Design a protein with these regions (language model features):
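Class I SAM-dependent methyltransferase "Motif I" SAM/SAH-binding loop
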Residues: 59-63
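A short acidic, Gly/Pro-enriched loop at the edge of an enzyme's catalytic core
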Residues: 108-121
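A short SAM/SAH-binding and catalytic strip from SAM-dependent methyltransferases
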Residues: 119-133
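A short glycine-rich, Lys/Arg-flanked "PGG" loop and its adjoining helix->strand segment in the class I
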Residues: 134-146
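C-terminal alpha-helical "lid/dimerization" subdomain adjacent to the S-adenosyl-L-methionine
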Residues: 153-210, 217
Length: 232
């Protein structure tokens, strides 16, 4: 029915194993790269986090990225958001077990994040799942402090379909994920762009520029991910 109608399939309609399975899939990359490579590559960000910054983690799922940042930067306050209530419930349980008092979780759509003048807003492997990624980026821009940064982490992809298939070993896997999960999730939302997890850096940076950020750059890349920095 999803393929016949093009209406998509909402994220919340998947079996619950999809949610914990997605977290388990991405966890090794976050544990291995987020604190040691990705954040240090973001110009001006790590010093703020060490001193004490306000951070929004949007589309946080079960909260792995949120908890890693909360543990590493105890002087900072992390607000984590996801529109999927059951995932937020599980994230709260996991954070409570770790005793993280600088981390709060909220059920919220990505385009409805409160304006808290965040120093850093992040989306990890979820921007492409959103029906209106440009609209979300514009909304996030409005929640940032004047010198705030938007960090977008997306699955590794190369520009150009042929180039990506031939030279990116993970492309076939992510095209499969995108067909079954990511694109249908996006199509089930307003606008329904259907960006997919293999858009490539040129397309993604173009969307961030379209959202009105003053500067956009590819800050880091690892075998698993692309990391973009967009400054307000």
């Amino acid at each position: 029915d999803v393929f016949q109608t093009g209406r998509g399939r909402p994220w919340g309609e998947h079996h619950e194993c999809c949610f914990c399975g997605t977290e388990r899939f991405f966890r090794p990359a976050y544990a291995g790269h987020l604190l040691d490579e990705w954040i240090p590559a973001m110009e001006g960000v790590e010093d703020k986090l060490k001193k004490g910054a306000k951070v929004a983690d949007i589309g946080c799922g079960l909260g792995t990225s949120s908890m890693l940042m909360a543990e590493q930067y105890p002087n900072s306050t992390i607000h984590a958001f996801d529109f999927h209530g059951p995932s937020i419930d599980e994230a709260k349980k996991r954070a409570a077990e770790k005793g993280l008092d600088n981390l709060e979780f909220f059920v919220s759509d990505a385009s409805a994040i409160p304006n808290e003048s965040y120093d850093l807003a992040c989306i990890f492997d979820a921007w492409h799942d959103m029906g209106d990624p440009v609209g979300v980026a514009k909304s996030i821009k409005d929640t940032l402090a004047d010198d705030g940064t938007f960090m977008v982490v997306e699955p590794m992809a190369l520009d150009g379909l042929k180039n990506n298939i031939e030279n990116n070993p993970s492309s076939s896997m992510f095209y499969g994920f995108g067909t079954l999960i990511c694109v249908p999730a996006s199509k089930a939302q307003p606008i329904g762009l259907g960006l997919g997890p293999q858009a490539g850096p040129k397309k993604l940076m173009g969307l961030l520029s379209e959202a009105g950020f003053s500067s956009v750059s590819l800050a880091a890349e690892t075998t698993s991910n692309l990391v973009f920095q967009a400054n307000k």
